[in-house]
Amino acid sequence: GFGSLFKFLAKKVAKTVAKQAAKQGAKYVANKHME
């Protein structure tokens, strides 16, 4: 049904957002160490 599709999409988006956040966090930490 529609509910399961929504759940699936929400999971996918959450995974992508987490990946992007991890990338940004790593960049931020690296920049802080460079200073």
Curated annotation (Swiss-Prot):
This is Cupiennin-1d. Expressed by the venom gland. It holds the Pfam family Cu. GO terms for molecular function: toxin activity. Keywords: Amidation, Antibiotic, Antimicrobial, Cytolysis, Hemolysis, Neurotoxin, Secreted, Toxin. It comes from the Eukaryota. The keyword Nucleotide-binding does not apply. It is found in: Secreted. The modification Glutamic acid 1-amide is found at E35. The lineage of its organism: Eukaryota, Metazoa, Ecdysozoa, Arthropoda, Chelicerata. GO terms for biological process: defense response to bacterium; killing of cells of another organism. InterPro entries: Cupiennin (IPR035164). Has antimicrobial activity against B.subtilis, E.coli, E.faecalis, P.aeruginosa, and S.aureus. Has insecticidal and hemolytic activities. Probably acts by disturbing membrane function with its amphipathic structure. One of its GO terms (cellular component) is extracellular region. Belongs to the cationic peptide 04 (cupiennin) family. 01 subfamily.
